[in-house]
A protein has these predicted regions:
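Nucleotide donor/acceptor-binding cores
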Residues: 2, 138-141
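Active-site-proximal alpha-helix that buttresses catalytic centers in soluble enzyme cores
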Residues: 3-68, 72
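Short, active-site-adjacent cap segments at secondary-structure transitions
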Residues: 13, 54-56, 78-80, 149-151
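Glycine-rich phosphate-binding loop signature in dinucleotide/nucleotide-binding domains
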Residues: 41-43, 132-139
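Active-site catalytic microenvironments for nucleophilic, acid-base chemistry
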Residues: 61, 65, 131, 135, ...
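Phosphate-handling substructures
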Residues: 64-124, 167
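Short basic (Lys/Arg) and small-residue
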Residues: 146
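Domain-level recognition of soluble alpha/beta enzyme cores
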Residues: 161-185
């Protein structure tokens, strides 16, 4: 069985909200959140990261420190939020409250204007995870990614219905274990 640990990037310079494909840098606090999360964790055989700098910059640092191979995986990018990118929920409540409510109630059924459908996001993330599982069978990977990627994988691993996806909470710099079964499905690891 392939063991996959998921690490969410730390706090970013532009703050929270719908960051999506925006390429924000980490704050010093964000760097520290990630360093603290991996302290004493591992060992890993391979590091895999989203190419966005809030993930990849830390991945490069950790790979150099630990002498590990690093693979940047474009399909582990965050969900693209279209017209909502760079905005937060409070801002959207001013002019898009109904749309935001539809997204929160059914993220698979409502796509933000100009955004990536969640079913498409899910497909690319699951293909990427299955590819990693096959390529690195039996190894332990650290995957540095985004809240949306982690929510998706953790919700599936926990057997949650799709409409409960947004109930999965993942903090900045949170490290969570996952495994990939021989069939490729994410499986929760008890912590």
């Amino acid at each position: 069985m392939t063991r996959i640990d998921l690490l969410r990037h730390g706090e970013t310079e532009q703050g929270g909200g719908f960051r999506g494909s925006l390429d924000d840098a980490l704050t010093e606090r964000g760097w520290q959140q990630m360093r603290d999360a991996v302290a004493g964790a591992g060992p890993w055989d391979v590091l895999v990261s989203s190419p966005l700098q809030r993930c990849a910059a830390f991945a490069r640092e950790l790979a150099a420190q630990q002498g590990l191979p690093l693979q940047l995986e474009p399909d582990l990018r965050e969900l693209h939020f279209g017209d909502w990118e760079g905005r937060n929920a409070a801002d959207l409540m001013q002019d898009s409250a109904e749309s935001l409510g539809l997204f929160w109630a059914d993220p698979y059924g409502f796509t933000p204007p100009g955004g990536e459908p969640l079913a498409q996001f899910e497909a690319r993330v699951l293909v990427a995870i299955d590819s990693l599982r096959q390529r690195f069978a039996g190894q332990r990977l650290l995957v540095i990614c985004h809240a949306g990627v982690m929510r998706l994988l953790l919700a599936r691993a926990r057997g949650l219905p799709r409409e409960r996806l947004l109930e999965v909470v993942v903090a900045h710099g949170e490290l969570l274990p996952l495994s990939a079964s021989p069939a490729g499905e994410p499986a929760a690891v008890e912590v």
